[in-house]
UniProtKB/Swiss-Prot annotation:
GO cellular component: cytoplasm; cytosol
Pfam families, per database record: EFP, EFP_N, Elong-fact-P_C
Family (UniProt): Belongs to the elongation factor P family.
Protein name, UniProt field: Elongation factor P-like protein
HAMAP family: EFP (MF_00646)
Native species: Salmonella typhimurium (strain LT2 / SGSC1412 / ATCC 700720)
GO molecular function term, any single one: translation elongation factor activity
Membrane-spanning parts: none
PROSITE patterns reported in the protein's UniProt record: EFP (PS01275)
GO terms for biological process, alphabetical: peptide biosynthetic process
Amino acid sequence: MPRANEIKKGMVLNYNGKLLIVKDIDIQSPTARGAATLYKMRFSDVRTGLKVEERFKGDDIVDTVTLSRRGVDFSYVDGNEYVFMDKEDYTPYTFTKDQIEEELLFMPEGGMPDMQVLTWDGQLLALELPQTVDLEIVETAPGIKGASASARNKPATLSTGLVIQVPEYLSAGEKIRIHIEERRYMGRAD
């Protein structure tokens, strides 16, 4: 079993009889000698969908669950439900808008390549996105000539409604690459 300091975002833990998906991890390093680093983890309970927050010391042993991953393509929206189709056997997987609210901020209208669903014991748990996505800037302050030398940023609204900080020289209509987990600008898209 792994230690708390080996846990990554997207892993699933069996903790206090609950299946919890790791949504976010904050690492708090103490300044006092001999004090242990604390890992504050935010989870989503698989069965109830409730948000759960727990703290662990770096050397605490945690029980992880092995999941099965299936490649999927976005198929269609049916009211409040989003349907994804298995790439191999065409099994439909349905999520409510609330279940994948975060992921929808990064998903272009027609879906994106390399998406996976996580299942455990036949139960649908989560939708996993690739590390990066290319999106178009739909609204931002106009680009400033000669701004490439400065490292200042400005907010930009992307085609999915997500707002991130981008360099000043970018303008509306440009496609950019975003690191999904860190919600940050990586560069212009190819």
